[in-house]
Design a protein with these regions (language model features):
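Domain-length accessory/inserted modules outside core catalytic folds
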Residues: 2-77, 81-156
């Protein structure tokens, strides 16, 4: 989430948002993983800019417990919002569209409002998760498109 938020908020220059990514990675500093992270950064930015909208958040797959996937999605949204805020300059945030501001508010609410303990393993809970995941995916694509005018806008 931190890498995608940084890309959506300001681009591939990670100087401002790398500390958020380091925090998300835990104990290992970026330097130890820089080649892999640079490759992942390039692939992620290509997916965000792809006119076929191939971007997918990196989250646990369907074989994992739903509660674990819900927690991972909440953590992804939290890291996204933190990195976006770190990457976007204050003046640029003031010029943000109302829709972009609402999307960031929604992602913040998802980060703080998803309760994995309230999720069972039934089809309704799985469907709810998939709908939230798709919203997050489209929100990231829209936020990227707003900050990168050459990218296609998804909008809704």
């Amino acid at each position: 989430g931190a890498m995608v938020g940084g890309l959506c908020g300001g681009g591939a220059d990670g100087g401002v948002w790398e500390p958020v990514l380091e925090a998300a990675l835990g104990d290992a500093p970026i330097g130890a993983r820089e080649p892999e992270l640079r490759q992942m950064l390039s692939l992620t930015e290509a997916a965000l800019a792809d006119p076929e909208y191939t971007f997918e958040p990196m989250l646990p797959d369907a074989g994992e417990l739903l509660a674990d996937r819900v927690q991972a999605l909440a953590d992804w949204c939290d890291a996204f919002v933190l990195a976006y805020a770190a990457a976007a300059r204050d003046a640029e945030r003031e010029q943000m569209s109302d829709e972009a501001g609402e999307l960031l508010e929604d992602l913040t609410a998802i980060a703080g409002g998803l309760d994995p303990s309230g999720m069972g393993e039934d089809e309704d809970d799985e469907e709810d998760y998939m709908q939230i995941l798709e919203f997050v995916r489209i929100a990231a694509l829209n936020l990227y498109a707003e900050r990168h005018p050459g990218a296609d806008a998804v909008l809704h």
